[in-house]
Amino acid sequence: MAKRQLPVHKNEQRDITITDLTYEGMGVAKVDGYPLFIANALPGETARIHVMKVGKKFGFAKVIERYQDSEERVPLRDEDGLRTGTMALQHMTYDAQLSFKQKTVQDSLAKFVSLQDVDVKPTLGMSDPWAYRNKAQVPIGQDDQGRLFTGFFRKNSHSLVPITNYQIQLPKIDEMLQTVIQILNEYNLTAYDEQTHQGLIRHLVIRQGYHTDDVMIILVINGDELPHQAAITEAIVAQIPNLASLIVNHNTRRTNVILGQEETLLYGEPYYRDQMLGLDFMISAKSFFQVNTPQAEVLYQQALEVGDIQADDVVIDAYCGIGSISLCLAQRAKHVYGVEVVSDAIEMAQANAKMNNLGNVTFVAGKAEDVIQEWQAAGIEPNVVVVDPPRKGLASTFTDTVIELAPEKIVYVSCNPATLARDMNRLVAAGYHAETVQPVDLFPQTPHVECVTLLMKNR
């Protein structure tokens, strides 16, 4: 069989028109039906491009010259954000970003006949969509003079781009990153090289309480000990205001997972504190806590409102983590049962419930489907189930358990429209219906979007 002749070839230059966007926000141009994906390009724009890579089904190109700009284009704030992929949408007006995210959700649902009539509301955005992240986790490099620097990996590569202003992190976090790097550079420490598995400093993680200003600093090292530990600790404590926790995390594995299993507390407590909707939370190094606090409060408020949580409701919060949604629910419901597979998170959730004087909440560590069946056997009958799963969505065994449980309402908080649509389709087939999905923008300048939807049991 003759090899199919592609309409473009690598290193070719040609003029194109952008007709669409991918779900990652890349521009799409088609040459005789063959799609080219192009960063920093918007629908309606015409440009001269250079073809970078050609595959059987699609290729990648870059813009050499734009002939016509979209009305939805704004000047780039930082080209490094495009090179690294940390701000893939920064060339779009913020209104256009919000519309893009609404359309991403609509397109995901439209792939299923059962969901094509579900109304996707306009995305709830921020008044200022910059400098919002309460958490930084940045790789550390080393320059030709042997000095450490903060950066981020160039997209689809192992090449580290030096960065000091990340644009989307809280400004104090960017300042603290440089302060800590300056301290480390006084002791001639080496940066980890993932190619050779040599060098010490892998990542620097800083978390800051949005409402409290509490700071947690985590030095991730490829080793058992941090040289000059006492002097480095003393310097960081002296120069970082509101330091609540200083930790060395030991990660000696060949992996791109940032945190290792073992950690050593150098100063303070093994947690920092922040607030969410007026509740206090202790947050450990490995605990999940939404990185955009103001928008997380919007997200959780939406979950409470669409679920219409009442004083006689019995609620199960699956994937409950440290209890950030559970405790918000417990302020309204009769009782909340939280389940989470990570036992450390459950210990933190129990401590958070106690700290907030909430006695109507029970936390159990285990697989959600197993624990829910145990609760059923014990006579617990929830009428509301809240889920906030990771990007891979609900495990099929968990979905089976929820269908068997048959709660009146399922409140689904999602960080991935594709798996949300897949899971909604299964639940609709099992006798539920959804009327609306509410997108919320927790990650401005990026293609990521969170959603809240209510699924009601058919009567």
Go through each PLM region and give its residues.
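Terminal RNA-binding accessory module
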Residues: 1-81, 363, 370
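Rossmann-like S-adenosyl-L-methionine
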Residues: 2-15, 20-23, 224, 228-459
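Short, acidic/hydrophobic/Gly-rich beta-strand patch recurrent on exposed beta strands
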Residues: 27-32, 151-154, 218-220, 349
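Extended interfacial segments that mediate partner engagement and assembly in macromolecular machines
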Residues: 64-76, 83-190
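Short, solvent-exposed loop/turn elements at beta->coil junctions and helix N-caps
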Residues: 121-128, 194, 203, 439-442
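Internal alpha/beta scaffold segment
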Residues: 160-202, 223-247
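Short, aliphatic-rich beta-strand segments
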Residues: 206, 213-222, 280-284
